[in-house]
Amino acid sequence: MDATDPTLYRSPVAAAAAAPEQIAYVAAFDPAGQMKDALAVLDCDPSSSTYGGVVGWAELPTAGNELHHFGWNACSSALCHEGHGGHDGDHHGLERRYLLVPGIRSSNTYVLDTKPDPRRPVITHTIEANELATKAGYSRPHTVHCG
């Protein structure tokens, strides 16, 4: 990476002064459980002609996951913390790129890549329930905290 990810900040003041997000990722599901779950991408730019609308969609392989408290692979505050590149000038390739999306009912965690097009995230990996239980001793992932 030739430059620091512009969505990573050295202080809360810098984060508050940054431009607002242009899109938002929102869990989408069928309450009846007949259709597959998805991650909807919403346009949050008030000056956009598609403001408030769904501008992207990533369908998951199954229904009934109950997606819950998902987050990024790297916190926007990563540069504030010792050892994360904020103090020694080495950013170690930090980039807010992957969404980690847990399903509290399925116990699966989906990894979605938001590059090269943030409006079209793609599932790159699924951490299956049995892998989570075997390797970490956990089930029912509730909240994913970043990096």
Predicted feature residues:
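General structural concept
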Residues: A40-D45, T50-C80, R97
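Sequence/structural signature of beta-propeller modules
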Residues: M1-S47
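A short beta-strand motif characteristic of beta-propeller blades
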Residues: T4-D5, V55-T62, H125-K135
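Structural signature of eukaryotic scaffold interfaces centered on beta-propeller domains
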Residues: M1-P20, E66-E95, G137-G147
